[in-house]
Amino acid sequence: MKASSQTAVPCLLMRGGTSKGPFYKAADLPSDKALRDKVLLAAMGSPDKRQIDGLGGAHPLTSKVGIVSQSTVPGVALDFLFAQLQPDNDTVDTTPNCGNMLAAVVPFALETGMLQVQGDQTTFRVLTLNTNMQCDITVDTTGGMVQYEGNARIDGAPGTSAPVVINFLDTAGSVCSGLLPTGKVRDTLTVTGQGFAPFTLDVTCIDNGMPLVMFKASDVGRTGYESVADMNADAELKTKIEALRLQVSVLMGLGDVSQKNYPKMTLIAAPQNGGALSTRSFIPHVCHDAIGVLAAVTVGTACVLEGSVCDGIAVMPTGAAKNVSVEHPTGEFSVALQTEPAPHLPGGQNVTQAALLRTARLLMRGEAMVPASLWSGPAA
């Protein structure tokens, strides 16, 4: 659909968890991937660190896009493709998942008529096309409509909202070859690079929904309790972390990740506020104000594995059902894990289920405008 010299692309601007961005129906975007990415970049105002000419919020957490379509997979209602854009470059990365944006998928589908309300609670299965991961998402639809007001609170988003419950069905090896892509619970590496002396540290490379490299903050000369501002201003630390990321990614089978936004890098320390573990996560070059959904699931999983870098630091509940509170700079993120003994596996435990609570909200409905010279819209 055109408006003057621009093409209007229908979308809903939505907050999903602690992220936000425009959501589109796949049919309203170009079918050609390269052209689609150019349209998304134009709509978001990238590349420009302020994203002044688009919808982006000048931060990786507000430079995200959701693309939704009806699924053809039996038993699955929706296909969801997540796209991570960056304010200051022209990359559109659809490799990793985003559990925060995932929270807004079913509300989007209900708001746009792709799905119908089932009752006071509505549950649909969603397939993430990024990694072929499936999950069941339940939203509050009391009164026959999506409810956004409620009493659920998540750290990193202001106020309270109606709950969105996400049950992940199979998250191990979302991008990597498996849960432990190096085949070990713990690896010892010596990191070299320009601008710092070589250093040796232990890492846990793990992917239970998001590829992470976890290591003790003390191994890079930090406490793990620094503020986000201090972390982002620490040029020496960021140089070391990036050198580690590029080096360890080869061991993880990810190859050259210099232009990728994974793996994420997570510094850990003993909990301070009654949780299981304290974290500071780089995504990968900016310190996260909180922690990503699937990163929290992956951190929680590492906490239950014997011999991981979390072993001896994390404070864990007993029993097969574990509620793991992952502390982050603005609060905590609780992940409900179901585990079973697995002596044949590295780490001795198998995580059979991961569930978590998020919230979402429709912020605006309308059309994103892109130059007609770039794309004239879907064929009639």
Model-derived segments and their meaning:
Residues 1-380:
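A glycine-rich beta-to-alpha transition motif near the start of alpha/beta enzyme domains, typified by
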